[in-house]
Amino acid sequence: MNLETVAKVDPEIVAAVRGELQRQRTHLELIASENFVSQAVMEAYSCVLTNKYAEGYPGKRYYGGCEWADVVENLARERAKALFGAEHANVQPHSGSQANTAVYLAVLNPGDKALGMNLAHGGHLTHGSPVSLSGKYYNFCFYGVDAKTGRIDYDAVARIAREERPRLIVAGASAYPRVIDFARFREIADEVGALLMVDMAHIAGLVAAGIHPNPVPYAHFVTTTTHKTMRGPRGGIILTTREYARDIDKAVFPGVQGGPLMHVIAAKAVALKEAMLPEFKRYQEQIVTNARTLADALMGYGFNLVSGGTDNHLMLVDLRNKNITGREAEDILASVQITVNKNAIPFDPQKPSVTSGIRLGTAALTSRGMDADAMVQVARAIDLALSYGPDEKKLEEARGIVAELCRAFPLYQELD
């Protein structure tokens, strides 16, 4: 990572960047929404396309000099369409939240009714939370998970849809560890005359590799981020049919955004090409293997997992039987250099700033090359940190496990 020029201009920023690199190298990253991009993605992200304004779309720009921007955006669009089997792709959204907002703008009027997953049950802020624009401008009602199984109750979803008659149904989640039945969601949407949007931000990499069912054949709109399991830059994509292509494009620009970030779109294109390689499928398979191994090992140590395990890259740990909160667990694990996020569990008695659980994901550790055997060690370190109270010897043992794993699976050696 060549920061010589930056160091001459702004040594404070260089110190922070180098500190962050050291943190990433020496900590176990278990936040489910984080990952480590490739060197190729990182280089594309920092290219000269950051200088180019390109309002509009390829062939229909509002600025001159966009011939190479058009090449880059067309490559990204065509790769997204090919990877997921979509008829149309918009690669301009700056984030998953922007992508979701654009879909709402395209098909809803303020006050229209929509049905989404309850944030407290694993949904996302942009699926109608009252603190989000989505909840302020649209009339969202909610479905959730069954109290006993921790899984989506599709019969309850259908019942709510019949009662509420939403214009749009939103499927997808930010903290749901099980396969989502998109075909069932489409049946429900068709029954009540609703459109279906799927937010696959967390599982897009698994979908691209054929490990999780693809929502594209079932949904009118599919949104995703390009980071998380996709291992690309931070950004968003919308996939849709030809029927809604124009509406979506107008909703993104000029609806919710101005000029696209062309350097980010270049990095998206690189990540999409990487996702087409055979090794990407093997990588995604290892993510799921690692998640299941970590889940099983944690349950072996007496941790309770929402829904009893995982089908994808993430798991929700219910800490109530350990007599600690999610916030306390996050802080304790940080002290042994394991990074997680506190997370509400379904029917959580704690407030969102405290929570009764933590969310764990295996995408970033898998990017470092860690395998199932390493996950057993990760589970051991988590148990040492959380199951024995303030025991400094146990915490030091956990730190030793973390340090050894970080040495055995180094990160970004090429950046030295």
Swiss-Prot record:
**Positions of post-translational N6-(pyridoxal phosphate)lysine modification:** K228
Q: What does it catalyze?
A: (6R)-5,10-methylene-5,6,7,8-tetrahydrofolate + glycine + H2O = (6S)-5,6,7,8-tetrahydrofolate + L-serine
One GO CC term, this protein: cytosol
Where (6S)-5,6,7,8-tetrahydrofolate binds, per the record, is at L119, G123, H124, L125
UniProt-recorded Gene Ontology molecular function terms = glycine hydroxymethyltransferase activity; pyridoxal phosphate binding
Where does this one sit in the cell?
A: Cytoplasm
Q: Which GO terms describe its biological process?
A: glycine biosynthetic process from serine; tetrahydrofolate interconversion
What pathway does the UniProt record associate with this protein?
Answer: One-carbon metabolism; tetrahydrofolate interconversion; Amino-acid biosynthesis; glycine biosynthesis; glycine from L-serine: step 1/1
**Of which family is this protein a member?**
Belongs to the SHMT family.
Function, please? Catalyzes the reversible interconversion of serine and glycine with tetrahydrofolate (THF) serving as the one-carbon carrier. This reaction serves as the major source of one-carbon groups required for the biosynthesis of purines, thymidylate, methionine, and other important biomolecules. Also exhibits THF-independent aldolase activity toward beta-hydroxyamino acids, producing glycine and aldehydes, via a retro-aldol mechanism.
Q: What is this protein called?
A: Serine hydroxymethyltransferase
Organism field: Moorella thermoacetica (strain ATCC 39073 / JCM 9320)
Q: Source organism lineage? A: Bacteria, Bacillati, Bacillota, Clostridia, Moorellales
